[in-house]
Amino acid sequence: MQDNKPIGITFVSENFSNSIDSFWIIIKPEILINPFDFISVENVQNTKTIGMIKELKRIYIDSETFSKNHYSTQINLLLNSDERLSGGLTVAKIDVIANLQLISFKEDISSNTSSPNKIPSKSKNWNINMPVQEGKLVTFATVEDVISSLGIPEMEHPIPAGVISMTNNIKIPIDLDVTYIFGPDTTHVNATGISGNMKTSYLLFLLQVLHQKLSEEGISIILLNTKEKDLLYIDKEREETYASEDKEELDILGLNLTPFNNVKYFLPRGLDGKPNSAHIPEKNYFTYSFELSDVYDRLELLFSSESTLDPQHNISSILNYIYELWPNLDQRGGDKGNPQKIANWTDLINFSEFPEEIVTHKTTLLKFQGMIQKYRKPSTLFVDKKVTSRYLGREIKKMNKNEVFVIDIARLPTLDEQAFVVGDVMKTINEMYSLGHANNPDDEYDSVGSGDEIDDQKEITKKELTKKPKYIVIFIDEINRFLPRGESGNMGLRMSMSNRSAVAEELLKILITGKSRHCILFSAQQFKSQIDQSINENTGLHVITKLGLSELSTNPYSMVDDTTKSVISKLHRGEFILVHPAFRHPIKIAIPKPTFKKP
């Protein structure tokens, strides 16, 4: 049971004033307390203020002046008989999280009617914005206090998001409503912090929880593995013994997490058709590769924006020509008047019969052929004919609810190839939604045919749609590779937006449309200053681990106050700061260690 002994007292002075947003307290000398601890103060008119420790400092207050205040009696009650106010005091600045009404189960109608200004005893949602008065005793907040102040009881579909651990050893489960993650309130999750501070572990923990909690409605997860073996064991039990502290945190959160199930691993095709991967799972793995017929309509994903927008070499006109006339590229035809067909990458490299209005300079064609050849020579990913490997786009379109796809790109030899895979996945998902795979089944059938045929077709479509997920999550670590920061300055910003790569544009579509689609992005990187500002602008939940103050001083962290930045620079491994509009202030949480195997 929690000990609610006083730990401090509220006060005001010439230099320390209280407002509706913050107030100051004197800390009892022997009490240990830390930033992000929650405290409780009973205020006027049967109300309670819940606050968070934001700043701690030592100050000097003249004891003679202090004793003149009318709350000196409470000071004496707070201190032990052998303690006296010395020249120095520890004081804390408290940010107000919420003002709560103390619920009374006794109706006192007469007192309510006789005192017009008294808050009704049964009012639960009273808009209270009164500064905390001086001379009020302060205690650590209870679990119920914290949960109520953060608005968790009002959440219709709570998703466990971590545990607050206070200095007095009280642990508090923290939830996020599913609407904070998938919309319509907010969407997307981004984690940032220096390497080795478990930012990826937090995102995977949240994904495990979502996979478990949303299985009835249907959720599918696509994980892009960018770091060697990092995500290639997620369906395996961890080998280390699970610590009692981690078990306790799982119990507090009401979770019984197991490794991911329904996992399929997609590994890039390597030499002789074998997987090009740092680890080959025991089962449920497939290789993937790309025929020209798979991606003829998205070749721009292979090229940088500089290449496609270069006025001297109009590569984009060639790409558009291929897309519009595929596979009959030569409209003029051969001797027999039949168009020349392009079947594979080799044919495309050797094809030179583009119309003059498409290829105005021979150097443009040579540059195009050279760039395609660049991907063909060292790579085993772009094949003329697949034998055992699969096309990712086709597999994603067949993805059923509660399946987990791990797409390994870690050992692809170039960033361009990695980006192409990411872009192809994003474009496939964007096409799925634009074609209405999750729409009303009445829109999913061909209207041509008899009434019975249409009814049969609708019934088949409805059965297929029941297998489709309501929610889709895409996880990308090191997203700064694929959606990097643009130039600074107003003109530079406009230029960088127009010069985004085709891959970046597909990612941007996911970010912008996530709310309406229930299709969201979980992303991570070391530094927010390295990523496109659109990620920060469209992300609802920001997860921050340890960072240096120089990084924290950059513009992407403007939503964090200076005191919180100071705490972030001192975080230990496994500690996370959550920033979300649902919380009036950032909160510090921890999570249990992963239940699946880590390489």
Named regions from a protein language model:
Residues 254-386:
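Helical/strand "switch-coupling" subdomains that flank nucleotide/phosphate-binding cores, especially
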Residues 184-189, 401-407:
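Pre-Walker A (Motif I) flank of P-loop NTPase domains
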Residues 573-599:
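Conserved P-loop NTPase motor module
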Residues 218-222, 262, 401-404, 468-473, ...:
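Loop/turn-to-beta-strand initiation segments
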Residues 161-264, 504, 533:
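Glycine-rich phosphate-binding loop of nucleotide-binding enzymes
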